[in-house]
Amino acid sequence: VTTQAVSGQSFPFSPIDPRERRISAAVMMSPSMPRRGDPKKAFASVAIPWLLMTGTHDEAPIGKQTAQSRLEVFPLLPPGDKYQVVFDGAEHSAFSDRALPGDSKPRNPNHHRAILALTTAFFDATLRNDAAAKAWLTKDARSVLEEKDVWQTK
């Protein structure tokens, strides 16, 4: 949620604007829907590139975020340099080095290889203006994923 706040999500009930203007691209691991307000408005002002990463079993150990609610963020983002990967079978801990208590799915070592490839290309494309990295994200990123993983761009 912090990354979402500092990189463009709006919070209508907040007296301050949490956006950090020096951030020009951001990666969301386990994106979250807003707890209050209109979700469409919350994400309408995201003006920088975002890469969202989640899994088909990405349930929050605290809070009320579900694997399904995490998938609801991407469609609400405005078009232009927005990307999402959904790792098949991945739980909330897929983005860490170890499983969390209560995890029930076996960890997939390819997820970390894909995370490394996707985030490196994303930051190369967005922060270094690397045309080859951007082309890879839009045309070939699927090559590091497994058959049931989902890759989306807009």
Cite the ranges covered by each PLM segment.
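Intrinsically disordered, low-complexity boundary segments flanking structured domains
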Residues: F13-I16, Q68-P75, L137
